[in-house]
Amino acid sequence: MIILGIDPGLARVGYGLIDCNMTQKKMLDCGIIKTSQDHNDGERMVEITRDLRYLINKWKPQIASVEKFFFYRSSTTIKVVQARGVVIMTLARFRVPILEFPPMQIKLAVTGSGKANKDEVSMAVIRELDLSKPPRPDDASDALAIALTAYYQQRIVK
């Protein structure tokens, strides 16, 4: 099963793809979708949609896992939530089932602690996927952690 993890953002959307079965998991790809600061928000949303469509067509994920937010205070946060909506819409258009996890659940799933910091999450991703170095940038590492959370949840369900 191929799982696509997404760490949403307007300037950068982290993505991580893992291939897994009940006993094994490996990283296929990870990186970021970087949008142009010179573009308006609408054009940036189009960039996210275009690049996410490319990833879906290339890898054909069976499940997508997206970070869920519980705060809506600043204008920056609103833009991130809007970008997250574009991600959800694009996945839905391709009929990719979507799992959503809050940050604390992601940290708990990959490190054993819901209060883990970025370095601890990154080290857990390295260990769990048997990587030689941390995925960069942090958004890509976070996206792999989000994909791993879906993997663990699916193993429990099955």
From Swiss-Prot:
GO terms for biological process: DNA recombination; DNA repair. The active site is at 7, 67, 139. CDD domains: RuvC. The RuvA-RuvB-RuvC complex processes Holliday junction (HJ) DNA during genetic recombination and DNA repair. Endonuclease that resolves HJ intermediates. Cleaves cruciform DNA by making single-stranded nicks across the HJ at symmetrical positions within the homologous arms, yielding a 5'-phosphate and a 3'-hydroxyl group; requires a central core of homology in the junction. The consensus cleavage sequence is 5'-(A/T)TT(C/G)-3'. Cleavage occurs on the 3'-side of the TT dinucleotide at the point of strand exchange. PROSITE patterns: RUVC. GO terms for cellular component: cytoplasm; Holliday junction resolvase complex. This is Crossover junction endodeoxyribonuclease RuvC. It is an enzyme of class 3 (hydrolase). Signal peptide: none annotated. Binds 2 Mg(2+) ion per subunit. The gene is ruvC. Mg(2+) 1 binds at residues 7, 139. Its EC number is 3.1.21.10. It catalyses: Endonucleolytic cleavage at a junction such as a reciprocal single-stranded crossover between two homologous DNA duplexes (Holliday junction). It holds the Pfam family RuvC. Keywords: Cytoplasm, DNA damage, DNA recombination, DNA repair, DNA-binding, Endonuclease, Hydrolase, Magnesium, Metal-binding, Nuclease. It is found in: Cytoplasm. The keyword Phosphoprotein does not apply. Mg(2+) 2 binds at residue 67. Transmembrane segments: none annotated. Belongs to the RuvC family. GO terms for molecular function: crossover junction DNA endonuclease activity; DNA binding; magnesium ion binding.
